[in-house]
Amino acid sequence: MLTVRFAPSPTGYMHIGNLRTALLNRLYADHAHFLTGEEVSFVLRMDDTDRERSKPEYEQSVYEDLEWMGISWDRLEHQSERLDRYRQVVDELKARGRIYACYETAEELEYKRRRQRSRGLPPVYDREGMTLTDARKREYEAEGRRPHYRFVLEHRETSWDDLVRGACAYNGAHLSDPVVVREDGTFPYMLPSVIDDMDFGITHIIRGEDHVTNTAVQIQMFEVLGGKVPVFGHPPLLTGREGKLSKRLGSLSSRELRGEGIEAMTIACLLARLGTPDPIVVCRSLKELAETFELSHFGRAQPHFDPAELFKLNPRVLHALRMEEVNARLEKRGEPPVDAAFWA
C-alpha cells in the first residue's frame, strides 16, 4: 500500500513551509488513489524527542492546523514513545561495527572544519574516532568526556530516481559519517527517521530539497538495516521576492492566515501549483484538487511565495462555496443568511 508520512516537530507553530510539505504528501497519496482506486495511507509522526522544546500546545496546534486544512491522517505515532526501539537498533549496529564512538568536543570539531576549509578541502569528518585505542578512550572518559556515536558510511556512490529532481547520486566519501547518538544519549533526526519509516511501511517520502544529502545518507541506513528503500521526492523550497524566504514569511503560521480570513482551500490551491507550469485552479476540496495534482510537474527552480497572492485568490475560493455552506457559517456567527439572488 502506498504510504506517505508527515513528521513535524512540535517545537513551535506550523508555518507555511510545514503546511506545504503536509499538503503535498496528502495530495500525492490521494492522487494515487484517484488513479488506481487502491488504498493509501498517511502517517502523522510527531518528532518530539526534543524534550526541552517540544510542548503539548504546539502538538495540539499541529492537529488543529491539519484538520483546518482538511488533511487527514490514518496513523499517529510519537518518536518519544519509541526510544527503546532506537536503542535496540543502535546496539545491533554497534555489534556489527557500523557505529563507532567519538570523543571530540564541539569546539574541536569546528577547529577541524576550519582547517579543512582553509586548505580548500570539504569539511568532512576525518574518522579519528575509528583509530582510538581502548586506552585512549578510557583516558578521554577519565577526563569527563562522554562519547557520541557515528554511523559508518560506505565510500561509494548512492543513487536514486527522485520524483522531482530525476536522477540523483552522491558519493559517501564526500559526506561526513552522521552522528546517530549524542553525548547525552539522545538521538538526532537521521537514524530514528529511517527506523520509523521501515517499521511503519513508508513507501514514499516527500520533503524539501534541503534534505537531499540526508537522503543519500539514509538510503545507506535502509540498506544496512535490510529495509526497502522508499521512493523519494524533493520539491524545491519556497523563496520570497528577494530570494531566500524571509524569516517573517517563512514563519507565517496557518493561525495567522486564518486570522486574516484566508480560506484553507486558498492556501491549498496556491501551494499545489506554486512551482509548476500548471495554472492555479479553484477547487472546493482536497479530493478534487488531488485529481489533477502532479508532483512531477514541480521544477527545480525555487518558487516565489507572496502572501499577496493568497489575498487575490481568496475571493475566488469564497465565491466557489455553495450557498448552504456560506449560510452555515453565517449562522455560527449569528448573522442573517444570504439568498440565491445575492450569492449568484
Language-model features: locations:
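Short helix-capping/linker segments at secondary-structure and domain boundaries
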Residues: A29-S41, F200, G275-I280, H319-M323
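Catalytic adenosine-cofactor/nucleotide-binding cores of aminoacyl-tRNA synthetases and other
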Residues: L225-A344
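Alpha-helix initiation and N-capping motif
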Residues: E59, L83, A106-L109, P122, ...
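Active-site cores that bind ATP or allylic diphosphates and position pyrophosphate for catalysis
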Residues: L44, A101, T105-H234, T239-L245, ...
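Catalytic cores of large soluble enzymes that bind and process phosphate-bearing ligands
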Residues: S54, H78-R82, A101, V152-L153, ...
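Predominant activation on well-ordered alpha-helical scaffold segments within soluble catalytic domains
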Residues: R26, T203, I219, M265-A268, ...
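Short, histidine-centered active-site or binding-site loop motifs used for metal coordination
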Residues: F6-P10, M46-D48, I195, D199, ...
